[in-house]
């Protein structure tokens, strides 16, 4: 049976400042940790990325032409405050005013994120969000943006608090490149959630007319063997690291006994302790019912089995299928069932996981209000032929995920929109330019845009709300 989505559903496209803008040192923009980290550790940089800094009118015109009525944009913190605080960079402020005006001119609603992996270098080098001073700097930055940009109707504080901590302190593929430090992972999650809560409370106290929420990456975790208690426990602990800890902070205003017991077990196996303060929970409690929406980024699920050995994580950054490895002491090991497809980067394709995660939020956190799927898409080594890409695999991937959204809505979940990652091809943090996600192919040499087959398909779905 053909499935449909509501008439008022937003069909969006997602971007991020550092992955799209380029112009990393232009017009007074301050440095971010990624600038030097990429030069030192990778075979690419974020210059010029998709040159969105100069070509956003082209991308927004394409968005309008192809039925995309919402766009995720992030503000580069160091474009506004080059060192994270203090002196304002007027040219950076002007750029975002112009960008938001172009969005509205093209009838593409901007959903604006304050922090998308790009803390200014001056703050990152003094501990990033492990340093509580930077909570204050973030709240001040948020306050400035809320006041300066009244044309923004939808704000999100952070993009993917979970993967920031994981990338920086567990996998070690994000600056500062620390591996296997679970205490730092949880402390980063916690301090960022406190920053989120304080920004949300400030926004509501000031009486701004828009909406505010947070974007969490929520990969669903399953036990490899549902009958094996050790596998079930491995999935529970993995879920706490990536999902439950931050969801509890967002919607409970504290960590449940089960969550805290899991954290204690993880730290007992891996070492370290957390600094959780009374004033932190006061802030979390004050904001738990103030979130207007939850953004869910969903790409994949994971299956976990029990594991007794030492921690080892190997990141598949070059699309060599089967080269990744993920096992954590005291938690478990990721093992993909044979029947589940995966991408060249070992990302498991499992649309049911999105449905299960949405229904989990609905059940466990009934104060969630509404959900947007703020990222979902297929990374692919696109083949450019006849001035396009025949990306049937991407179409199939998105179609399957839209279908489970239709199911979730039918089953009572309040899902209001979907943002494909990504609007156009952008630079990928730990994969460079080979891994493409866009509806529009970008020739990174010429910066020309070309609609892929998926862009034409997405336009039809957006216009009809029929998933076909």
Curated annotation (Swiss-Prot):
Keywords: Glycosidase, Hydrolase. It catalyses: a 6-phospho-beta-D-galactoside + H2O = D-galactose 6-phosphate + an alcohol. D-galactose 6-phosphate binds at residues 19, 116, 159-160, 297, 428-429, 435, 437. The active site is at 160 (proton donor), 375 (nucleophile). The keyword Hydrolase applies. GO terms for biological process: lactose catabolic process via tagatose-6-phosphate. It is an enzyme of class 3 (hydrolase). Belongs to the glycosyl hydrolase 1 family. NCBIfam families: lacG, PRK13511.1. This is 6-phospho-beta-galactosidase. It comes from Streptococcus pneumoniae (strain ATCC 700669 / Spain 23F-1). The gene is lacG.
């Amino acid at each position: 049976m053909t499935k449909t989505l509501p008439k008022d559903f937003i069909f969006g496209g997602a971007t991020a400042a550092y992955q799209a803008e380029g112009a990393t040192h232009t017009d007074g923009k301050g440095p971010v940790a990624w600038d030097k980290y990429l030069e030192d550790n990778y075979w690419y940089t974020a210059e010029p990325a998709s040159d969105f800094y100069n070509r956003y009118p082209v991308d927004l015109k394409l968005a309008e032409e192809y039925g995309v009525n919402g766009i995720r944009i992030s503000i580069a913190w160091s474009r506004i405050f080059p060192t994270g605080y203090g002196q304002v960079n007027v040219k950076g402020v002007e750029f975002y005013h112009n960008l938001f005006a172009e969005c509205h001119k093209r009838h593409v609603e901007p959903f604006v994120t304050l922090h998308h992996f790009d803390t200014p270098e001056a703050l990152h080098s003094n501990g990033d969000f492990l340093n509580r001073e930077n909570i204050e700097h973030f709240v001040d930055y948020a306050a400035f943006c809320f006041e300066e940009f009244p044309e923004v109707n939808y704000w999100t504080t952070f993009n993917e608090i979970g993967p920031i901590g994981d990338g920086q302190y567990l996998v070690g593929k994000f600056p500062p490149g620390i591996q296997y430090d679970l205490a730092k992972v949880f402390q980063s999650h916690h301090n960022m959630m406190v920053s989120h809560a304080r920004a949300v409370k400030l926004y509501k106290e000031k009486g701004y007319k828009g909406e505010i929420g947070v974007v969490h990456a929520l990969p669903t975790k399953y036990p490899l063997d549902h009958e094996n208690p050790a596998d079930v426990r491995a999935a529970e602990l993995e879920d706490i690291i990536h999902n439950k800890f931050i969801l509890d902070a967002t919607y409970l205003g504290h960590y449940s006994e089960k969550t805290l017991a899991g954290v204690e077990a993880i730290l007992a196996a891996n070492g370290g302790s957390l600094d959780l303060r009374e004033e932190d929970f006061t802030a979390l409690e004050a904001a738990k019912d103030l979130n207007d929406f939850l953004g869910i980024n969903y790409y994949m699920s994971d299956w976990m089995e029990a594991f007794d050995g030492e921690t080892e994580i190997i990141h598949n950054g070059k699309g060599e299928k089967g080269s990744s490895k993920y096992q954590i002491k005291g938690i478990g090991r990721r093992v993909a069932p044979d029947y589940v497809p995966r991408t060249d980067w070992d990302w498991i394709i499992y649309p049911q996981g999105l449905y299960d995660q949405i229904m989990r939020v609905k059940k466990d956190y009934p104060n969630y209000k509404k959900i947007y799927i703020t990222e979902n898409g297929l990374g692919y080594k696109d083949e450019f032929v006849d001035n396009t890409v025949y990306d049937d695999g991407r179409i199939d991937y998105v179609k399957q995920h839209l279908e489970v959204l239709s199911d979730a809505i039918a089953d009572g979940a309040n899902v209001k929109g979907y943002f494909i990652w990504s609007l156009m091809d952008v630079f990928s943090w730990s994969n460079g330019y080979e891994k493409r996600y866009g509806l529009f192919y970008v020739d990174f040499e010429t910066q020309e845009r070309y609609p892929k087959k998926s862009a034409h398909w997405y336009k039809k779905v957006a216009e009809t709300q029929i998933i076909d």
